[in-house]
Amino acid sequence: MAFQDPTYDQNKSRHINNSHLQGPNQETIEMKSKHVSFKPSRDFHTNDYSNNYIHGKSLPQQHVTNIENRVDGYPKLQKLFQAKAKQINQFATTPFGCKIGIDSIVPTLNHWIQNENLTFDVVMIGCLTENQFIYPILTQLPLDRLISKPGFLFIWANSQKINELTKLLNNEIWAKKFRRSEELVFVPIDKKSPFYPGLDQDDETLMEKMQWHCWMCITGTVRRSTDGHLIHCNVDTDLSIETKDTTNGAVPSHLYRIAENFSTATRRLHIIPARTGYETPVKVRPGWVIVSPDVMLDNFSPKRYKEEIANLGSNIPLKNEIELLRPRSPVQKAQ
């Protein structure tokens, strides 16, 4: 019969001998949970939209969740957008359209400049359609006399044409008159969109450019910190994505809203040097004079327009409610 120590506990001995095989106790786990590692992890989560497009033909912009309501979750910005839209409609001229051929655009605008003494504070050239004759407009038209100082110029074109126009905008003579400020981008939701560029081209390329680009240029000197009566509610993002509410037409309403929110000017002109056809109509908009071969209304009168501007004023007046809500440039501290 084997001798057995009276102090020996078989279960306790098994527990002690096997302690090195068990995991850490609760106290050790709590200590490790408090430790935070700042080293980058090798395994990280990525949204591989290129892979999604290859396998499911789903474009990256279709995965953006807040394109329908860009200010969702920001009640202050929602209130600002509503108040600003209401004020813009209140101080807008009659929707004017000037229906003329492409070859008559430059002579007509020259007549307005020389004989009617018309100037505009905001001028937008181009739309979301192909075959635009933008280069002749920029080279033949005295835009420095058509646009007031300070003033704003928006030029919309596809990726190919905007690269050609960039060479012109970098020209020394042009740079003295207009200072290129920002670039805006509009992206259609998919290839079925009427705004998808290159639909009239039959050849297929490996890489397709689907964006529309806009160069925003400024005449004169404008500072955000001191010229709040000119640059007012610049809360729109530089990237715009087509929404379900975007109506069929040559110009989405969001393109107009960017210019309306950016500047308080009431004298706005839109030049569309292209035939858009009946499938993509050019609709008039309150507060704008739209010059196009296919504009749906031809009612522009320089005399009537100047009378309405005289009653409204050349700038939208400041409103306390909007002033309290709109973002401002930070005030620099005196050193």
UniProtKB/Swiss-Prot annotation:
Outcome of mutating E260K:
Decreases interaction with VIR1
Superkingdom, natural source:
Eukaryota
Protein name, as recorded: Karyogamy protein KAR4
Q: Where in the cell is it found?
A: Nucleus; Cytoplasm
Q: Which organism does this sequence originate in?
A: Saccharomyces cerevisiae (strain ATCC 204508 / S288c) (Baker's yeast)
Q: What is its main location?
A: nucleus
Protein purpose: Component of the MIS complex, a complex that mediates N6-methyladenosine (m6A) methylation of meiotic mRNAs and is required for initiation of meiosis, progression through the meiotic divisions and sporulation. May assist STE12 in the pheromone-dependent expression of KAR3 and CIK1.
User: Might you report a single GO cellular component term?
Assistant: cytosol
One Pfam family assigned to this protein is MT-A70
Q: Where is the composition biased (Polar residues)?
A: 16-25
Indicate the quaternary assembly: Component of the MIS (mRNA N6-methyladenosine (m6A) methylation) complex, at least composed of IME4, KAR4, MUM2, SLZ1, and VIR1. Interacts with VIR1.
Molecular function in Gene Ontology? DNA-binding transcription factor activity; mRNA binding
Q: Which keywords does the record carry? A: Cytoplasm, Karyogamy, Meiosis, Nucleus
UniProt lists the family membership as follows: Belongs to the MT-A70-like family.
Q: Which InterPro entries match?
A: METTL14-like (IPR045123), MT-A70-like (IPR007757)
